[in-house]
Regions:
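Surface-exposed, low-complexity/disordered Ser/Thr/Gly/Pro/Asn-rich loops and linkers
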Residues: 75-130, 215
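Extracellular carbohydrate-recognition regions
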Residues: 26-85, 222-251, 256-264
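Extracellular carbohydrate recognition
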Residues: 111-117, 149-150, 205-224
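Extracellular carbohydrate recognition and processing domains
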Residues: 163-192
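Extracellular beta-strand-rich recognition modules
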Residues: 59, 120-144, 195-205
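N-terminal signal peptide c-region/cleavage motif recognized by signal peptidases
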Residues: 19-21
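Contiguous beta-strand segments within globular domains
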Residues: 115-120, 129-139, 250-269
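Bacterial N-terminal signal peptides that target proteins for export
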Residues: 1-11
Length: 269
């Protein structure tokens, strides 16, 4: 289309004024509320609805933060590297660091205090009685690849009663390395058999760094379990499978294809 100069000039001026008018309609205003976050909304809804039995956690699904459908995290890290003899791949580690890697206390002279916690979501135990045979079992270890807990350090398990008070039901004060072992407790006190039951693990140690480490795995709460809680029957990977590469855990495909025979490790060993 061949437009004369006056017409093209008028079109250009019209477009300029339209752009200025449109630009004038935009104003920067502060947010009046936080935009909804679908992920956070799902987590919050999981916290509102009580968990039902059986409660089962082997820490194999989530890495880093524990499963928000089951837990309220207070600093623990789900990993597979802080212990060399876990019952299966994945466990939660307690130490003196927050989840973001910062210490709870910046003063190295503070030798003991509460550090990481791991709290269950609300669990509905309403309608159960002391005769319902509710059992809780878990596997735990001390030190592993971290520092050995000191004399005043401990790992504590607490139950929340009907009045909302936390009652200590188990603790251990390991002064030496302890490989993973199991513990089984009866939940047969009527104070704990209510609709808003919770339990939590609390670590006490040096809160200024990666000290006084504990690990936790296979946390199970169930009624009349059809298995022996002290005998795990789980077809599971016990550690991270090693790389099929000879020299690396991973490498660019282009580099591998240059010499696959050289880069491939012995997959039979």
């Amino acid at each position: 289309m061949n437009l004369s100069f006056p017409i093209r000039f008028l079109l250009a001026v019209s477009c300029l004024f339209a752009a200025l008018a449109a630009q004038a309609q935009f104003r920067v205003l502060p947010l009046t509320q936080t935009p909804p976050n679908p992920v956070r909304a799902n987590i919050q809804s999981a916290r509102v609805q009580a968990v039902t039995l059986p409660f089962y956690e082997d820490f194999s699904t989530y890495h880093g933060q524990p499963d928000p459908n089951l837990w309220i995290n207070g600093g623990t890290v789900v990993n597979n590297t802080y212990d060399d003899l876990p019952p299966s791949k994945g466990f939660a580690t307690f130490d003196g660091l927050r989840f973001n890697g910062l210490p709870y206390v910046n003063n190295p002279n503070v030798t003991s205090g509460p550090t990481d916690t791991l709290t269950s979501q609300t669990i509905n135990l309403g309608g159960l009685t002391p005769a319902s045979n509710v059992l809780m079992s878990f596997w735990w270890s001390a030190q592993s690849f971290g520092e050995t807990p000191d004399r005043n350090d401990s790992l504590v398990l607490q139950f929340k009663d009907r009045a909302g008070a936390w009652i200590t039901r188990w603790l251990d004060t390991a002064r030496a390395r302890r490989d993973f072992r199991d513990t089984v407790l009866q939940v047969n006190d009527a104070r704990f058999l209510h609709e808003a039951f919770q339990f939590r693990f609390v670590a006490y140690g040096r809160p200024s760094g990666m000290f006084d480490a504990w690990n936790l795995d296979y946390v199970i709460l169930d009624r009349n379990p059809a298995y022996n809680p002290r005998s795990l029957r789980d077809v599971a990977v016990t550690r991270q499978p090693r790389s099929i590469l000879r020299r690396y855990s991973s490498m660019p495909l282009e580099q591998f294809l240059v010499s696959p025979t050289t880069e491939m490790g012995n997959v039979d060993s």
